Each structure stands twice: as structure tokens, then as C-alpha cells.
């Protein structure tokens, strides 16, 4: 299996206290660069006589670049090349809506959502651009995450960032 991670952007709708993105350039990958990366992976797989490609979409917040992700997935489907492809995405989940949900289900994505704990713990670090916590917004998306799990049989994975100000609560997540 070839594991290809595509950073579709360096943009985010949050300003998490521990994040490095403040120092980034707020750019988005072009379709052509994503296509070149996929083409490279396909060539590599052929040389290795392998036929499994996993593409991980990350950011910033990758769902900000949903159109790019859709275009790159469509490209992979178009070239096919007798390659089995799996897709994953790591997201803060705040931009998830019905359209994105349908796309993730139709393309058999695995989904990882960032959540640092209960409301108090999560909202210490994961804040929006207005300085507000994001826990409540994410919880409003629970019905979409539940629908994803029911339709795919795949669990939503949780990405938990342990920092100096939440490490004592880590056992509450487990």
C-alpha cells in the first residue's frame, strides 16, 4: 500500500492555541499539484506491483477546500488504473453539511474528527476566530456523524491533541 497525504490547504476556520498554522501562508494546493502527486503514487505502485493507494486529505481544515478534494477524488476515479483506493480525511468537523456527508459516504471515506475533550477542556484550546469555543458547534453536527456511521458501518475516529493544559483530563477521553 502506498500512503499519500495531500495537504490541500494551509487555511483554517479555527485558531487553536497549540496550532502552527498561524505561521503559514493561508494557501491552497492547486489541482495540478494534487494530480502530479497522485500520478507519482500510481507510477510508484506499478513499480512495486502493488494496487492499493490510500489518500489522506489534511489541512489546515481540509473541508475549506472541499471543491479541490472533490476534483482530486474524481481524477482518481477517472484514471482508475486497476488501483484500489481508500480515502481518509482529518477535519475539525465544523463545516460538515449534508452535501459533504453524501460525498464522504459515496466515496467510502474514513473520517477523523478533532476533539480535545468535554466542552470545558475542548474550548480551552479549540477556538474560532472570534475567540469562542467550538464544542457546541461540533455537537450540533453529531446527527451527521451518526448518519455517516450508520450508512458506512465505519466509526468516526477522534483525533485528540494532548497539551500541557489538558493532559490531566486525558483519561476522560479514553
Model-derived regions: residue spans:
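Short, histidine-centered active-site or binding-site loop motifs used for metal coordination
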Residues: 20-23, 57-59, 126
Amino acid at each position: 500500500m502506498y500512503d499519500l497525504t495531500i495537504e490541500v490547504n494551509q487555511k483554517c476556520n479555527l485558531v487553536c492555541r497549540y496550532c502552527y498554522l498561524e505561521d503559514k501562508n493561508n494557501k491552497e494546493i492547486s489541482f495540478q499539484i494534487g494530480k502530479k502527486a497522485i500520478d507519482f503514487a500510481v507510477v510508484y505502485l506499478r513499480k512495486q506491483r502493488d494496487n492499493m493507494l490510500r489518500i489522506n486529505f489534511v489541512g489546515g481544515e481540509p473541508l475549506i477546500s472541499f471543491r479541490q478534494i472533490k476534483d482530486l477524488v474524481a481524477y482518481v476515479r477517472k484514471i482508475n488504473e486497476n488501483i484500489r483506493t481508500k480515502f481518509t480525511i482529518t477535519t475539525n468537523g465544523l463545516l460538515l453539511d449534508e452535501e459533504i456527508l453524501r460525498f464522504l459516504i459515496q466515496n467510502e471515506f474514513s473520517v477523523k474528527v478533532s476533539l480535545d475533550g468535554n466542552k470545558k477542556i475542548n474550548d480551552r484550546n479549540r477556538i474560532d476566530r472570534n475567540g469562542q469555543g467550538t464544542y457546541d458547534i461540533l455537537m450540533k453536527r453529531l446527527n451527521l456523524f451518526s448518519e455517516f456511521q450508520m450508512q458506512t458501518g465505519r466509526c468516526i475516529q477522534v483525533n485528540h491533541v494532548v497539551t500541557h493544559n489538558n493532559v490531566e483530563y486525558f483519561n476522560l477521553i479514553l
